[in-house]
């Protein structure tokens, strides 16, 4: 069966939701209360712990397999950015680093070149920047454009490029 990484991630999310639902079923039915004058079998919920537990295990195995195939896809599929080829797994690390740098440098974009501080008696103090304002603005714009380019290319690959998974994972 062929899937895109977007579909594989949706399948993983769906399986995890099913696990969460089955966990809830176990919590609600693993123990039950019965009045002293009530027949226990009449009060016992219709529930098979072992079957439910095995369903969870089966779904967990599917998630492990899907994530493995997704990771293999991410380590083998390359995307070109600025004339350099990156595998998706490297690109995900790279875009996280770029976002950190974008946040850091963004905090200096609006920093005034010179700022008057509070008066201490007769002396007036100023705080001055110790960097090139033009560099900061240009670098912020460059990083922003690069992150956007990467995200668009990742989205395109995630939604269009298919890879093979075993049929039993669907």
Name these PLM-found stretches.
Residues 1-170:
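Structural preference for solvent-exposed beta-strand-turn elements
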